[in-house]
Amino acid sequence: MAEDLVFELGADRSLLLVDDDEPFLKRLAKAMEKRGFVLETAQSVAEGKAIAQARPPAYAVVDLRLEDGNGLDVVEVLRERRPDCRIVVLTGYGAIATAVAAVKIGATDYLSKPADANEVTHALLAKGESLPPPPENPMSADRVRWEHIQRIYEMCDRNVSETARRLNMHRRTLQRILAKRSPR
């Protein structure tokens, strides 16, 4: 199994992991090293961009939300410096809009956290021609509406009044929706 994986990886097995969740980063780094990757890690957008500029890797796994900015900034630098880099974007916020944005900028795939090393490896090595199977449970209209509200809310820097204006709804209505669906 390990020999087959190294063969699939090719000559350049360099992998950049960018995530600000240190325990997750360490676990994933250890697991990916066992799978034959040669690792570099970064915990911020600035670190990730610096490594991408200096030593663009063959593979990259980038968290979407980092403390100092957006992981898509790292994806852009990786794409510029090494167009053949296979990039997987990870996020704890699985939304269609962010997945589309990540793929448009140049990500090869998009996974929701928590993703294990097998899922990440499969996404990094998957051939582009194979289409993923259709989802077993398609999103409901309520879920689509909620994700749209969340996307606009984040776009407005979590400003309820501005979000309500953009969504063409009363501020109190939006507050009730957010309160009802927020994690407790």
UniProtKB/Swiss-Prot annotation:
Q: According to its UniProt record, how is this protein modified after translation?
A: Phosphorylated by RegB.
Which InterPro entries does UniProt cross-reference here? ActR_PrrA_rreg, Bact_response_regulator, CheY-like_superfamily, Sig_transdc_resp-reg_receiver
Query: Domain named Response regulatory: which ranges?
Result: 14-128
Gene3D superfamilies listed in its UniProt record? 3.40.50.2300, Homeodomain-like
Q: Name one GO molecular function term.
A: DNA binding
Entry annotated with the keyword Cell membrane? no
List the SMART domains hit by this protein, alphabetically: REC
Instruction: Please give the name of this protein.
Output: Photosynthetic apparatus regulatory protein RegA
